[in-house]
A protein has these predicted regions:
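Anionic ligand-binding catalytic core segments
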Residues: 1-108
Length: 108
């Protein structure tokens, strides 16, 4: 899950939101989001975020900038995951989830 906030004149990902990665803690839970985004909870792609942003009156460039920022942060995410208290299997599952979902946002 994710959350946005606007500290000044730009939207940013919240520094902390839903800190429990349910997808690795409970692999039987197949939903990626608790609430729907553009009518979906799973297999979200760029088009779904763009639709939601347009519905909220946000420009496409804001969504694209947020995704670019997430991609830039990926090395830091990997470092944090691997320095965490998680087991090696959980670390791999967590990293795989992050990478897979970011890759999905790049698909057209």
């Amino acid at each position: 899950n994710f959350s946005l906030y606007r500290p000044a004149d730009s939207y940013q990902l919240a520094p902390a939101y839903d800190l429990v990665n349910v997808s690795i803690a409970n692999p039987n839970d197949k939903e990626e989001l608790a609430l729907t985004l553009s009518g979906r909870k799973n297999k979200l792609k760029l088009e779904h975020f763009l639709h939601a942003a347009a519905t909220m009156g946000l420009e496409e460039k804001i969504v694209l900038r947020l995704i670019a920022n997430m991609n830039k942060a990926l090395p830091k995410w990997k470092t944090l995951i691997h320095s965490s208290f998680l087991s090696e299997d959980m670390k791999k599952a967590y990293e795989d989830t992050v990478v897979k979902r970011l890759e999905r946002l790049q698909e057209q």
